[in-house]
């Protein structure tokens, strides 16, 4: 039971960090004001890694429309998560051989990191769309609704072209949540 609690805490910690880095890239891509909430929170959580990466990465890539430094930060965090997870739970299970950490162990770790990165991206998108859908019913005039609308519009616009409104209700958010959930099920 202690191992499950430790796994949950480790995954939650890295989920927040990776999600914040991906959200920072998405918010920059959507030209959202980063000085307001949740932008200031996202910047506070990710500045320690994104700012040094901006100095190291080529300027054209690090500060492009999609914030490359934030995407690289999310990828690095996913790799660190995979390494920590493999070492920690391999040692606790008694299966870790720290001397045999070579190229053969690298591919499964990278696959694990990519899976974590994709899962966090899908779940973050689902949270944004779910929040947007709820606010569209409860408080459509709020600043949070406007922010979530800007963040989810690139995801919802293609579906709105295909799915008609029924009785004045836009079902594109529901369809996207279903698509994201299916993608998470396929991811495993």
State what each model feature region is.
Residues 1-188:
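Selective transmembrane helix interface/packing segments
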